[in-house]
C-alpha cells in the first residue's frame, strides 16, 4: 500500500525542486558578515577595474594579500595540520597574517608583484576556459584542469614581466570584473555560480546554471573590456610605474652629486689655505742699471792697485752693489766712486 502511494507521488509529474530555485521570487536569507564582506569587495572591485594601473602599489599589495591569504586558508582549513583540524577563525587569522607578508613583498619588490599579477590573470582565463569547455566536453582526468591552470598562469606571468603596463591593465581590469561578478552572484543567487565553477575544478557533476546565472557570468567579459578601455584611455594614460622608480633614482643621484661637489670644494679650500704663501715683491730695475762684468772687474783692479782694502771700500761707498752671476750685476749709475789721493 505504501509502495503504491510512493509510486503515485513520484508519477504525479511534479517539477524538479531545482527548477523552482531558479525562480527569482524564491526567498533568500543573507548573513551579516558575508554581506559586509561582499560590499567591501565591490569597492575593491571598482578600484581594480577602473583605477588598477593608476594605484599600482596598492594593487600590488592587494594582489599579494588576496593570493597569499586564499592559498594559506585553503591549506589550513581543508587539510589537517599536525593531526589537528584547525577552526575557521584560526585558519582565517593565519591566512591573514601570511597574506599581509605576501602583500608587503609584492608591493616592495615590483618584479614579484608583476609576476603575481600575471598569475592571477592566467588563472582567471583558465577557469573561464574550463567553464566553457564543460558545455561541450567533460574532462575525464583532474590533470586536465590542473595542467591548463598551471600552463596559463606561468605563460601570462612571463608575459606580464615582458610587457608590464599592457598586461597589468588587462589583469587588473579582469580581476576587478571577476570580483564584481562574484559579489553580484552572492546578492542574486547566494554563490550558485561560484559553486558551479568550484565543481568544474573538482570535476564533479552539478546542476546546470540558471538563466540569470549566465547573465551574471556575461557581466565578467563586459566589465573587463570596459575596464581596459577606461584605464588605457583615461586613468592610466600618461602614467608609468617605471617613471616613479626612475625619478626617485635620479633624485638620489642628484643628491649624491651635490654632496660630492661640496666635499671637493671643502678639500680644495683646505689645501689652498695650508699651502698659501705671500710672494716676494719683484725687484725693480731701471734703464741703464745693468753694468758689464768687465767694467766691474776693472774697477776692482783699480781699487786693489791703490792699496785700498775691500772693507774700507764698503764703508765709503754710499750704495750697495748687487751681484748677479746669471745676468750680470746691477748698481745705480749715480753711485759715487771713492776719492783716491795720490
Curated annotation (Swiss-Prot):
GO cellular component, one term: vesicle membrane
GO biological process: Wnt signaling pathway
Keyword annotations: Cell membrane, Cytoplasmic vesicle, Developmental protein, Membrane, Transmembrane, Transmembrane helix, Wnt signaling pathway
Disrupted gene: phenotype observed: Morphants have defects in neural crest formation. At the tadpole stage, animals are often less pigmented with ventrally bent tails. Embryos develop smaller eyes and forebrain structures.
Pfam families on file: TM7S3_TM198
Result, substituting residue 172 to A: Very weak enhancement of lrp6 phosphorylation
Cellular localisation: Membrane; Cell membrane; Cytoplasmic vesicle
Assembly mode: Interacts with lrp6. Interacts with casein kinases.
Protein known as: Transmembrane protein 198
Source species of the chain: Xenopus tropicalis (Western clawed frog)
Gene of this entry: tmem198
